[in-house]
């Protein structure tokens, strides 16, 4: 592991987590629960199912609170007996919050917020000794000198828990930015969160389809800051790195991920590339995804660049392809191995007339 704050693999940091876990136990801030991870997951799953069916939220919260208090009821003798028997345990943090009280916190995107104090015990270490995100976040981000945490808004409900853990450990909490979720447009016109299984959520999708990194970055910039498009229109020759990015310009509501707009942005970006830049990007993509096409490009690079140069440059450069995949299909016309007649001539055409017509066209075509 390179860097000043390694090791970076969670499995290699077990001793570090356990040291801080012992501190919390000694401080009376944590306690063991002798249940397997499967049993804990079953409890969580049952809670979720109950929440979906039960509309009496107050009663449900009371039941969970009573179950939590019951978990805290144990003696040292009981713990020693469980340990002597070799039983595994999960380690819980004891929440000291009052849900009727509020914590004032500043989110760098959302401004000043008031959130309920944490009143639910949370798992710090699972029964295999591996920390949960809650605990690893506090320990790792402190030891690695993290000053700003940027994460999705789905973590806002956990913010009180994390602030509590930083306080328990005696650490200074970082500054937080909770960004809005990416949304996708459904067929019925509604919007929902972009899932990791949706097209566009995985960077491998962009590589496979042949989007140039510059195009994806350009599009993402339009999502990050509301004034980027206006700035870019006024500064068409400047790089995105020159843009005065402003956290306060980030949206609080979910922005819509639009593949069609990505295509428009990509076509515009590629239209400004030189033939050499297009060739290099196309070849890099073909080397990974289409070996035969890559071989044709390498065999005659000047010919490939000549094809790429068609309609490139000038005041109105061509904008009919936005990915290397689309460009490959376009270039198929110029290679014998991939040339295909899409619309064959009707059978009733006289062959001699066809030959005469083609000869006349070839003679008049100024290429």
Pin down the residues of each PLM region.
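Non-transmembrane alpha-helical segments in soluble domains
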Residues: 18-25, 217-220
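Active-site cores that bind ATP or allylic diphosphates and position pyrophosphate for catalysis
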Residues: 10, 23-26, 30-193, 202, ...
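Hydrophobic (often cysteine-bearing) scaffold residues that line and stabilize catalytic clefts
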Residues: 13, 17, 158, 212
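Short glycine-enriched loop/turn motifs at secondary-structure junctions
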Residues: 2-4, 144, 200
